[in-house]
Amino acid sequence: MNLIAAVDKNWAIGCKNKLLVSIPADMKFFRETTTGKVVVMGRKTLESFPNGQPLKKRVNIVLTHDKNFKAGDAIIVHSIEELREELKKYPSEDIYVIGGETIYKQLLDDCDVAHITKIDYAFEADAYFPNLDEMPEWKITQDSEEQTYFDLEYYFVKYEKQVQ
């Protein structure tokens, strides 16, 4: 399974249920990487999308404790166990965990690849991604050249979990 996220220099991912910054090249990378695949998210992540609707051209799976929650054609699950059962229907390499903070932490151990856009700036934030640089089992296997968006510098980095 894969994780995909944009993080700042403190591994922050959001503030007040919004992304820290919207970088067009990062959004394009996200679209190209996840289109036609399975995306897994929490309810608050889904609600942060335009009109709170599932992403087009993807299988959307939403984890929520709210038994009455519905969202378009999204598949709704209510526990990690139910989510893991649902995910067995899909090839692991086609599954992308897209947030937010709680879902990333809950599914980190199930994943073996992380596509991280690292932004060289510290934003005000209240949601964080686990710091993969502090986890010896996660190694950088690809690192892009420095990219810029106005005065922000960022990199596309691929981490892979090493089998211990």
Q: What is each stretch, according to the model?
A:
Residues 1-164:
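Enzymes that bind and transform nitrogen-containing heteroaromatic metabolites
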